[in-house]
Amino acid sequence: MSATESSSIFTLSHNSNLQDILAANAKWASQMNNIQPTLFPDHNAKGQSPHTLFIGCSDSRYNENCLGVLPGEVFTWKNVANICHSEDLTLKATLEFAIICLKVNKVIICGHTDCGGIKTCLTNQREALPKVNCSHLYKYLDDIDTMYHEESQNLIHLKTQREKSHYLSHCNVKRQFNRIIENPTVQTAVQNGELQVYGLLYNVEDGLLQTVSTYTKVTPK
């Protein structure tokens, strides 16, 4: 183990093997049992009843844990750049399962700053992807690249790449949020007062969430 690895704050590394993974899991399970002795036997073992569907990017730096939750509270779906195409079968099935079957009453679409998918398009590196055997990733990022070009006039006023990346991350949450709230399953649940939808942006620099958009039933005055 190198000096860098020995001083790392992380549990596992590229050099970790199966034994390391199982040992880390055993330690985690023991710690969870010490913190919440009833979590596994009395709650998780008897099924799930999550209150929230969390849709996010597959980036390793954040997940539903940013909500401060325990296993069993949040149903999760993540993909590269948290893209939600309206006709995507996985998206539609996930929304149906979470809302109709699991009865969640909150859907969160959560993007994040410093997104690799966004930066790839912002820095025009997407065009090189097919040359390094990433032709599927090239095609997949078409939605982000389209957004990048749609926002080109607004990006002109931002000075740094960091500012532009942050702005596009914010735009991407709005973009995917607007698709989610057009989903029939979502619309029905919201209009019945059974669901709220939140668009959030996670900042990788401080771990905090920022509200981007909300969709709830409008109550007549």
Curated annotation (Swiss-Prot):
CDD domains: beta_CA_cladeA. InterPro entries: Carbonic_anhydrase (IPR001765), Carbonic_anhydrase_CS (IPR015892), Carbonic_anhydrase_sf (IPR036874). Binds 1 zinc ion per subunit. Induction: Transcription and activity down-regulated at elevated CO(2) concentrations. Its EC number is 4.2.1.1. It is an enzyme of class 4 (lyase). Keywords: Cytoplasm, Lyase, Metal-binding, Mitochondrion, Nucleus, Zinc. Pfam families: Pro_CA. It is found in: Cytoplasm; Nucleus; Mitochondrion intermembrane space. Transmembrane segments: none annotated. GO terms for molecular function: carbonate dehydratase activity; zinc ion binding. It comes from the Eukaryota. Zn(2+) binds at C57, D59, H112, C115. GO terms for cellular component: cytoplasm; mitochondrial intermembrane space; nucleus. Belongs to the beta-class carbonic anhydrase family. Present with 2330 molecules/cell in log phase SD medium. This is Carbonic anhydrase.
